[in-house]
Amino acid sequence: MRVLILGSGVIGTTTAWYLAQSGCEVTVVDRQPASGLETSYANAGQLSFGYTSPWAAPGVPGKAVKWLFEQHAPLSIRPTRDLRQLAWLSQMLRNCTAERYAVNKARMVRLSDYSRDCLNELRASTGLEFEGRQLGTTQLFRTQQQLDAAAQDIEVLAQYGVPYELLSPAQIAQYEPGLAGGGAQMAGALHLPEDQTGDCRLFTQRLADLATQAGVQFRYGQQIERLEHAGGEITGVQIDGRLVTADRYVLALGSYSADLLLSLGLHLPVYPLKGYSLTIPIVDAQRAPTSTVLDESYKIALTRFDERIRVGGMAEVAGFDLSLNPRRRATLEMVVNDLFPGAGDLAQAEFWTGLRPATPDGTPVVGATPYANLFLNTGHGTLGWTMACGSGRYLADLMQGRTPEIDTEGLDVFRYLSTRSTRPHREAA
């Protein structure tokens, strides 16, 4: 079976790997000169299998109004003329109930839990290295209210057997001794020991190298223009003015996936959540994070690489704007100085922004479409790397006609389509 994958970020590349391992003839197309150079380039560096939660949560609508007037708010909304922004925000608000939050979080944890197992198997079988650590995430709560609100998340963790440990303020330094050098006061913390860290760009590019050795063809520097279709199937993709054909197609273009589907009559509610990061060279390892620390107040993660600290987070609903906002840099620097003062050289930090492809309910869109030979793998939001291996392997199984190893309920695009939309009949490859 010949498969054409559109997009070579961490999602497209992991999908290519698992399809190649399944015996498919795989080609990956991307506009960049290498894999992992857009949203995967400088994300927060987290593999947050335990800390998997939708942004659409109870209390967020009220907080969003408050955040409009705060300098260091974790979420900001900049209205555009794009009506899809308004529609996406409206759908997100409808998912901010306790009932919808529980359903959405359970779906996300299910996929993340599976993805952890897939990643561990991948590392064991290939020896893939990406400056990774397996020392967990420590989620910091500055207020008792935040600590109390974590109770619902802990219920879901317990339901899925995800290990966790609640920490008193005095216990936090056992996992992150560098925090002792800061002046921030904490009400407590949640430690998730199975979470991991690393450089997503390194992971993506080194996996692309392994995939190339396995026979995958990567075609870089090529512009994907449109999907051609007839009779309920994709007949090819216009790339740099020529038609490229395959037996099956995978759309893994992140925030740009929705535009390509419009000509097919599919309205995919994937919208960019703009995030920022700083990559800081370490000058004092004793003051630096040991693994990943997540500041619940500012939704900012501080992650340790070998000789660098990656500080990332925040979410701007601002369309496809890739400009660098100096106010966001100030927020990142403020959190670093508050938690790990003197750990890194901020003057030498690399400031970056990327567009995370987010759905209104937080769950990605992975699976079949009404077009018999078109599959989607997008909409992972802030958890693309966390869910990448599980999403890629699940999709490879689905496309090969094998029964997936996890419950697929609520993962594909059909949860957003009208009841008149039908799933295409498929035969095993």
Curated annotation (Swiss-Prot):
Binding, FAD: 3-17
One Pfam family here: DAO
Keyword ATP-binding annotated: no
Class of the enzyme per the UniProt entry, highest EC level: oxidoreductase
Record keyword Transmembrane helix present: no
Keyword annotations: FAD, Flavoprotein, Oxidoreductase
Reaction catalysis annotation: a D-alpha-amino acid + A + H2O = a 2-oxocarboxylate + AH2 + NH4(+)
This enzyme's EC code(s): 1.4.99.-
Top-level taxonomic group: Bacteria
Signal peptide, first to last residue: none
GO annotation, cellular component aspect: cytoplasm; plasma membrane
Gene3D superfamilies given in the database record: D-Amino Acid Oxidase, subunit A, domain 2, FAD/NAD(P)-binding domain
Cofactor(s) the record lists: FAD
Associated pathway: Amino-acid degradation; D-alanine degradation; NH(3) and pyruvate from D-alanine: step 1/1
GO molecular function: D-amino-acid dehydrogenase activity
GO biological process, one term: D-alanine catabolic process
Job description of the protein: Oxidative deamination of D-amino acids.
Cross-referenced HAMAP family: DadA
NCBIfam families per record: PRK00711.1 (NF001933)
Protein family membership: Belongs to the DadA oxidoreductase family.
Full protein name: D-amino acid dehydrogenase
Organism whose genome encodes this protein: Xanthomonas campestris pv. campestris (strain B100)
